């Protein structure tokens, strides 16, 4: 003990100038001075004297199970605790009675940190890496496996919180069996929370504060699953605080009771003291049972982008018990049933897919949530997401999914990169087709898409504005020109087309053609044996017809509708620029299909069909 006392005194003298790395094992080794793996500190001695080390020191814990004493010390300095990344994991366990489960007689807190710093203060920084926290049993107020108090900068990386139990349920100071963060700033990344339970107020995580300027939490690339609480958040309870950012994270399989305020993520509404803002980006909250996926009280404050939130059967996607202070969407979300007490519907973006048909089964099929959706279009591209979030102040990494897989330039919404929904169209030997889809899509290689901006006499003005690789807006009716084959296109959540000049229309299913003009004539793309590929009246009078699903049609009114056909030739502007072919004597037709009683030499300038070929007379 005398040697240890001298060692501690030496460490304190050195701490003013630099941080020191120490090595720790369950029982220690060699000289037990922490200078190397071979001379590791023993955990019991190190932990009992934890605040004697210098702020900034780093502790490397060997693999093994570290049984934390019933009265764990409160750490007041900024340290880095690093667990083993190979072989046996580093486990902080509360299982003092050694029966393998969390119950009476086990430790209630495995690590408590109280640095007494405010948000943004860099004087003390606490870091946890590669450590499992398990079998804490809480039966008193304000305790958890990881308890953070008044600490302005805590990072928790690649840690696991499992099988912790909070049985206490008196007053309001309970819940959050895995982590209770009180008036602190904590960033979780690549962490897992599972198998934790509480009577209520957060089966896994409870976030609270005593001041409106404290309480910042980020969950990035985390997995929160199979936790339980009867009420107020089977996964997370946001009680008081500034904000909670849920990014690239899955929350699934958590179980609530069936009565009261039941949901996987529960939040109190904002007020004059606490903003309580929840921001959900690139995340999946789905398949949680017993209540809504997200439940907020009156004045809940929620922002959403590029995420999937769906329930199943009676489990709503989102419910606000009153009127939200803010429900702000940056778009590209897949949302199931949403309900609130407001008189007006939320201001969803046109790139959001909000539908009662969006359920766990319809989106994920036979996949588990962790596998990613089986039926979802692409969400935001990287530039779109950056632009959409430009005013949100998000600094977290958005480039990787929950598994660390790169999202690339575009990926499906939610936490897991997966293959997108697809559509298809076929271009024949005539090199043209039309296409319409309620979703956007990415134009495939060897194809360009055009809108019809005008009709003049016998010609159409076609603007091929969508080149291969470009993103086509949702609900775009296009004329396609490309190499003959069948194409598969990746569908995408996208803002709806606002191209008011486009004279093409489309339907997502077999439906009768329509127009705002009662006197409109309707044309469909067809390949006439004599005139060639073009837009033709579907019947002799240009009346409405049944348009095929995912096809586009042309609707014209006024003088332009007197033409029965507009023949295409594959040039960028419709029929303009057709090369003159050799003249020969034969039956001659104009583009309206009428036979012309004149020789080719005596025709006026224009385009004619001779022997089934297009001929320009200049």
Language model features: what each stretch is:
Residues 55-80, 87-90, 322:
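N-terminal extracellular ligand-recognition/capping segment immediately after the signal peptide
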Residues 122-229:
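Right-handed parallel beta-helix
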Residues 18-45, 65, 369-370, 376, ...:
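Right-handed parallel beta-helix/beta-solenoid
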Residues 420-443, 467-531, 539-575, 617-618:
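A short, polar beta-strand/turn micro-motif
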Residues 455, 571-618:
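C-terminal outer-membrane/trafficking sorting elements
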Residues 78-141, 165, 197:
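Right-handed parallel beta-helix/beta-spiral solenoid domain characteristic of secreted/periplasmic
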Residues 25-62, 403, 590-600:
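Acidic Gly/Asp/Thr-rich repetitive segments characteristic of extracellular carbohydrate-active
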Residues 70-80, 187-189, 207-210, 216-390, ...:
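Predominantly extracellular beta-rich ligand-binding scaffolds that present long acidic/polar faces
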């Amino acid at each position: 003990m005398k040697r240890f006392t001298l060692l501690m005194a030496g460490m304190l003298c050195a701490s003013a100038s630099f941080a020191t790395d120490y090595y720790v094992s369950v029982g220690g080794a060699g000289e037990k001075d922490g200078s190397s793996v071979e001379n590791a500190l023993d955990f019991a001695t190190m932990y009992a004297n934890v605040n004697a080390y210098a702020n900034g020191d780093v502790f490397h814990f060997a693999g093994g199970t570290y049984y934390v004493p019933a009265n764990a010390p409160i750490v007041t300095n900024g340290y880095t605790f690093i667990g083993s990344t190979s072989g046996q994991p580093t486990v902080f366990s509360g299982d003092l009675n050694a029966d393998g489960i969390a119950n009476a007689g086990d430790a209630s807190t495995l690590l408590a940190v109280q640095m007494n710093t405010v948000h943004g203060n860099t004087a003390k920084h606490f870091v946890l890496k590669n450590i499992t926290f398990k079998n804490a049993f809480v039966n008193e107020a304000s305790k958890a496996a990881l308890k953070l108090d008044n600490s302005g900068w805590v990072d928790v990386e690649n840690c696991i919180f499992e099988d912790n139990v909070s049985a206490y349920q008196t007053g309001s100071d309970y819940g959050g069996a895995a982590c209770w963060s009180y008036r602190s700033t904590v960033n979780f990344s690549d962490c897992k929370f599972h198998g934790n339970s509480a009577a209520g107020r957060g089966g896994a995580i409870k976030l609270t504060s005593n001041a409106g300027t404290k309480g910042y939490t980020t969950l990035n690339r985390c997995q929160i699953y199979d936790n339980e609480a009867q009420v107020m958040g089977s996964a997370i309870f946001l009680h008081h605080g500034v904000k909670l950012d849920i990014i690239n994270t899955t929350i699934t399989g958590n179980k609530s009771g069936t009565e009261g305020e039941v949901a996987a993520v529960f939040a109190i509404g904002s007020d004059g003291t606490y903003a309580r803002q929840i921001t959900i980006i690139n995340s999946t909250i789905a398949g949680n049972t017993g209540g809504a996926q997200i439940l907020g009280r009156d004045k809940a404050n929620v922002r959403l982008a590029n995420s999937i939130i769906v329930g199943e059967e009676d489990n709503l996607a989102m419910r606000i018990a009153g009127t939200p202070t803010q429900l702000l969407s940056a778009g590209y979300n897949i949302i199931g049933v949403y309900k609130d007490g407001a008189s007006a519907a939320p201001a969803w973006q046109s790139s959001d897919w909000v539908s009662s048909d969006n359920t766990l089964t319809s989106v994920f099929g036979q996949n588990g949530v962790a596998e990613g959706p089986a039926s979802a279009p692409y969400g935001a591209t990287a530039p779109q997401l950056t632009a959409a979030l430009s005013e949100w102040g998000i600094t977290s990494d958005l480039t990787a999914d929950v598994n660390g897989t790169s999202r690339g330039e575009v990926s499906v919404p939610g936490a897991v990169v997966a293959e997108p929904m697809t559509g298809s169209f076929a271009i024949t030997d005539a090199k043209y087709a039309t296409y319409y889809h309620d979703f956007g899509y990415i134009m495939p290689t060897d194809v360009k898409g055009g809108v019809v901006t005008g009709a003049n006499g016998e010609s159409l003005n076609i603007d091929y504005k969508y080149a291969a690789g470009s993103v086509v807006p949702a609900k775009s009716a296009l004329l396609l020109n490309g190499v003959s084959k069948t194409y598969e296109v990746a569908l995408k959540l996208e803002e709806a087309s606002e191209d008011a000049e486009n004279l093409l229309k489309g339907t997502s299913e077999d439906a009768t053609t329509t127009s705002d003009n009662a006197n409109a004539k309707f044309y469909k793309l067809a390949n006439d044996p004599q005139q060639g590929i073009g837009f033709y009246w579907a019947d002799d009078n240009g009346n409405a017809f049944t348009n095929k699903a995912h096809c586009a049609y042309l609707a014209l009114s006024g003088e332009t509708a007197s033409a029965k056909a507009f023949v295409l030739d594959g040039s960028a502007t419709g029929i303009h620029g057709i090369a003159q072919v050799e003249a020969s004597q034969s039956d001659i037709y104009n583009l309206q299909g009428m036979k012309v009683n004149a020789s080719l030499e005596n025709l006026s300038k224009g385009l004619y069909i001779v022997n089934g070929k297009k001929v320009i007379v200049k």
